[in-house]
């Protein structure tokens, strides 16, 4: 069986074709039950312009969700996706290119076991405890 993970990836819309090609090469977006689903997302944020006015902005992202995956380094598909994200990770303090790539992996024990980039700028991770 092995340890299973939820994998959440966010990339700028401009990078979608490149990641799709990598995922298609490894058959991660194919079939009746693909490893990943994806959706468009508009991130809202505010910034100050040159006149010190507060400006509302939006950034276009593509979000990929994978569930119940074996996400181990050393697997060819995992290494290909991780390498792509590591190439331009999101850093909220980088003013030159404020829109990078990010990923967060959550294990079946609800622990974050790996992350690339400042994922918390897009993903809000919560653990919910409910009564049965």
Which residues does each predicted region cover?
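Charged interaction segments
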Residues: 24-132
């Amino acid at each position: 069986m092995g340890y299973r993970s939820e994998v959440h990836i966010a990339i700028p819309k401009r990078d979608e074709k490149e990641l799709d090609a990598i995922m298609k090469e490894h058959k991660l977006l194919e079939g009746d039950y693909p490893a990943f689903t994806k959706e468009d997302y508009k991130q809202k944020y505010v910034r100050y312009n040159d006149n010190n006015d507060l400006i509302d902005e939006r950034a276009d992202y593509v979000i990929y969700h994978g569930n119940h995956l074996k996400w181990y380094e050393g697997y060819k598909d995992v290494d290909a996706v991780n390498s792509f994200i590591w190439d331009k990770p999101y850093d909220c303090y980088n003013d030159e290119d404020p829109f990078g790539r990010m990923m967060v992996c959550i294990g079946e024990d609800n622990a974050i076991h790996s992350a690339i980039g400042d994922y918390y700028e897009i993903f809000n991770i919560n653990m919910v405890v409910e009564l049965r």
